[in-house]
Amino acid sequence: APQGAAVVSPTSTLMAEGGLTAEEVAEVLDLPDGVDPLAFNPFADGVDATAALAVEKISQQIMTAVSSFASAAEGAGASETGAFEAALTSVVDVVKVKADNLTDTTATAAEKSIDFTAAADLNLIKAKVADAAEAVVTAEGTSGFNKAALTALVDDTATSIKNVNDQIEAVADLTSDATKNVFSTLQVLNEQVKTAAETQKAGGTGSIAFTNA
């Protein structure tokens, strides 16, 4: 998170990694009016419940995208740290392009915002993941990375992210057991994706159950 941030969150991390302002991130992510990514804690006492729900859902969706693409890269042979860096870089690069478009009068609304339930936006991210992972692996000197295995799984990984993020989008509160169950599916998805990539790397055909969720 940027220096001076009161909370560390996926949104503040995007700011720090992308060199973006709070205003740019809030607009690209379509955060509720008045929400400061550096200070807003959806679980703090007295926060607006509607804003808290919206912000936490977006945070969960960002984490689903980053961690799932990272799991695919790790399963294909990248280090855990390198895989996360590659996935985060892929997301940040797309967000930065959207932020640059905020001042472009010819850009469409979709080109100025990111929706982690939209296949089109997830496709922009997935197109960067394999190259980003390869770059990180090369810089680290990690051996055993199989780019083809990762490339073979990015489509299903993106589809699975969309399916889980659609479930997150449908959440109506932050406290019910149903919500906690939805938020906990992220870990299950990550394990499925990593295992599928490991299978692909070993010469098999990896599959992700959440592709059909």
Residue ranges and their predicted role:
Residues 1-213:
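Feature for extracytoplasmic/surface-facing segments of secreted or surface-associated proteins
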